[in-house]
Amino acid sequence: MGRCEMTFVDAQIDRIVGPTHHFGGLGVGNVASQNHAGQISNPRAAALQGLDKMRLVAGLGVPQLILPPQPRPDFRLLKALGFSGSPAEMLKSALSEDPVILSAAASCSAMWTANAATVTPSCDTDAGCPVLTVANLSASLHRSIESTHTLKDIASLFRSGFDVRPALPGGAPMRDEGAANHMRLSGSDGKSGLNVFVYGDGPPEPQCHWPRQTKAAGQAIARSHGLQESDVFHFKQHPKAIDAGAFHNDVVAMSHQDLLIHHELAFAPESYQEIERLERRFENVIQKPLRILTISSNELKLDDAIKTYFFNSQIVTASQSGNTKWTILCPVQVQQNPVTHELVNRLCAEQIFHAVHFVDLGQSMDGGGGPACLRLRVPLSEQEFGHLATSALWTESRDSDLRAIIKERYPSELKIADLADIEICQKALEIQEVIAQCLRQDSGSI
């Protein structure tokens, strides 16, 4: 393996929420999504809330990259599923015959970029470059249409010196939801780390919800990325967590460098030996103990963990004035819940984190995504970072331009029936193209 020693940074990639953002209730095993199905959404607020988080992250000295919304509605999907005629006729037919398909075609779920891909940094593989495999998201119709466009976006962002791969084939047996079910544990010195893949299939199965990640998918990615077998770990997600609404691992666990925080019901008992192997291997490779904080059900009920998305907080290493500080970005729901508020205060008092910020992501949260859902974390060396396209990097001027577009052109209310209005949909596609053009300017390298 590449036991390199160089400075790495965790670039954060977020996607702007699209103008057809709505509450379709499509998320498999996603309690928040299902509970808000049919409610009126606010696409303008959703996009601005996402930009507010990006601004905060960039202000902490963390590299923040921006992707445009994927084009929606997806008329190719409607046509492939048997709807014909003009675009206006296709929309009306879909609404009357199968509104779930219409909702899927207009879904903005690609905003949750933690599901965009699984990332291996160059120091973990002999490939000599970062390797990214786009997630197939084959567990859901509305998400399965994302991978083709995601591949184009990521390939455009990571130009030279990166290995960007298409989604795994294989359908249901190879269900893959990307980085939301992957944790990388490491030191802070740029040396190779250990990779944990979390899956939900296999006995005992959940009783209520279909697991969206398979063990076979994680194994395939580990092989494909050239990861050393001794440095790869597969944890089975606890069926109770999946049934409670933890449709991804990042709803009940979070990690950063040498820290793993998880709910006691995050992992199934059959994973305990694998966790012990991880601890031994980490100390052997990284030359320091792995810090594992297990949050008990007595301290935090599983239902409260999922309602607040405490474990979906975003951990970053802030870099300001030459100093680095571990900072955690929590949903405001964590602050509003006395138990989780006390928990994060305790973690700060114990110097696990040096600072906490509470972020309002109400529109994303109602769809089932917190701060960590909205970002794809990509560890990059300084040289690799320099190869990224300048047009994707957050800047004050780019932020200002995007806010102006969103405030002027995004709707402030949207319901599913509106998605059958051809004027609304044409305007949405025009807005998405304007944003894409904004993020294609100043092309080059950073």
Report the location of each language-model feature:
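The feature marks the mature, well-folded catalytic cores of soluble enzymes
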Residues: 2-446
